[in-house]
Amino acid sequence: MAEIDVTKADVLRAIETERDWWRAVVDLAAGNGPVTGDEPVNGFWTYREIIGHVNGWRRWTVARLEAAANGTGRPVPPWPAGMADETEAGTDEINAWIMEQSRSMSLDETIAETFSLLDQMRDAVERIPDKRLLTPGVYTDIDPELATYPIGAVVGFSILHVHEEHAPDLQAWLSERIGQHAELPPTPSGFGYED
């Protein structure tokens, strides 16, 4: 892996840029009439389900960042024991579980959780010492993959997932909803990390 020049300020700025991006999505969706959350976005998931899916995985991001900030070692994943994301089938099983959990939440609750998780990410990053946040191999007790990545990279991975997998669908849906190209803030930096 090539060395990547990232600072704690870069990580915090990316979280705030992600917050701005989500605020624009929510505002654009609500700015053109009532939104129930059940509007189909991509033929597979609704608006609320996409947000719930992102939140489900962000809970795991927050858990790992909190473990690093608190020095508590590997956290328990937010999904049931026995589910693992090491294979595509395992990831599909986790996604189905996340989807089932998110269906019990209202759109307002789902959106509120989005911003709460971003706050938790920011707060945890602020508490992790700079060098430990950005040095690979420091937190292998939290996640073995962190042998080659710093804990700060999980923020980048979380952001990349949204903007590679879900942002194009959300932007297309918003554009259709408002009847013109939906202008969203720039994509936050993933710091050059690739998951």
For each predicted feature, which ranges?
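Solvent-exposed interaction patches of small proteins and small membrane subunits
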Residues: A2, V6-E16, E39, G71-G73, ...
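Acidic/His metal-coordination segments adjacent to aromatic residues that form catalytic metal sites
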Residues: E3-T7, F44, I94-D108, P144-A153
